[in-house]
Amino acid sequence: MMKLKAIEKLMQKFASRKEQLYKQKEEGRKVFGMFCAYVPIEIILAANAIPVGLCGGKNDTIPIAEEDLPRNLCPLIKSSYGFKKAKTCPYFEASDIVIGETTCEGKKKMFELMERLVPMHIMHLPHMKDEDSLKIWIKEVEKLKELVEKETGNKITEEKLKETVDKVNKVRELFYKLYELRKNKPAPIKGLDVLKLFQFAYLLDIDDTIGILEDLIEELEERVKKGEGYEGKRILITGCPMVAGNNKIVEIIEEVGGVVVGEESCTGTRFFENFVEGYSVEDIAKRYFKIPCACRFKNDERVENIKRLVKELDVDGVVYYTLQYCHTFNIEGAKVEEALKEEGIPIIRIETDYSESDREQLKTRLEAFIEMI
């Protein structure tokens, strides 16, 4: 099957993003680095600033991080810190300030060390989901707005906020369309291509992301009309994010006869689900408050989302993916596994890191799982 032109364009845009980003900085635009899907990018864009995801998906930077951080810590946290300490991530080096958030204990404490290396602002994300917690979160988003205005010198007007809300909602709309197309049999796109799309959506200029998504949807609609695509056991991945560089599990699944048709993760549905309904700071805050991350207490809607995706995408089996020492997702995995087994949905739990040492072992386990379902 011919390669998708939109994915080739995605790779080209990613290859030239560093040069483009530094040119945008030379034009006077501020860059806000971020780690997490909870950071409301509409606020940053409304001040003509640039939100950009930060590196954290490589094993190479972990040794330098372990000079300061414990070995028994999530590899994403160590890799991120190592990239900044080693000064090898262009997005870190371009960032005028980094926005952190109180999602997990490891990141919170790592930020105390990272703020020695780069200016930081930490958003307090309440872990409860009640009205009092929502009020706290709305205030945190208002504080972010004040910070962004101060850092950029640009006033965030109602008009600019409306423009950026509409633009980011457009990205969400296009990802929804992509997921609709993935319901087809055969699947019109490989999971690895979609993973790269999510990974780079955190990095690319938003207008480039929109253009690539529009082109991709046209190509996939054509494939669906022709009945072209990828056969195999249909797999939903759920769990920890897979930031750029961390493709191991998806690669293995598709090597052994599976096809990934959905991702319930921050490099997946949590990135785009739910539109901002309205144009106020409060409306923006409410949308992000709904994100069902495992760091939240009594995160029952995540379980329901997974069951819904299994049905909508006609999934044959679920791969629950956890990074080593990610206690939040690992513990919540027990609830997810129990709920899916009650529904008769096959599930396998995988715990791994960024190294290649367990690739063959994972390949054996995933191959057996796919044969079983």
Swiss-Prot record:
Q: How does it sit in the membrane?
A: Single-pass membrane protein
Predominant localisation class? membrane
Domain of life, per the record?
Answer: Archaea
Give the record's family classification: Belongs to the FldB/FldC dehydratase alpha/beta subunit family.
Alphabetized UniProt keyword annotations: Lyase, Membrane, Transmembrane, Transmembrane helix
Transmembrane as a keyword of this entry, yes or no, is yes
One Pfam family of this chain: HGD-D
Q: What class of enzyme is it?
A: lyase
What protein name does the entry list? Putative dehydratase subunit MJ0007
Any one GO CC term of this protein is: membrane
Organism expressing this protein natively: Methanocaldococcus jannaschii (strain ATCC 43067 / DSM 2661 / JAL-1 / JCM 10045 / NBRC 100440) (Methanococcus jannaschii)
Give the EC number: 4.-.-.-
Which residue positions does the secretion signal occupy?
Answer: none
Give the residue spans that cross the bilayer: 32-52
Give any GO molecular function from the UniProt entry: lyase activity
Q: Which InterPro entries match?
A: FldB/FldC_alpha/beta, YjiM-like
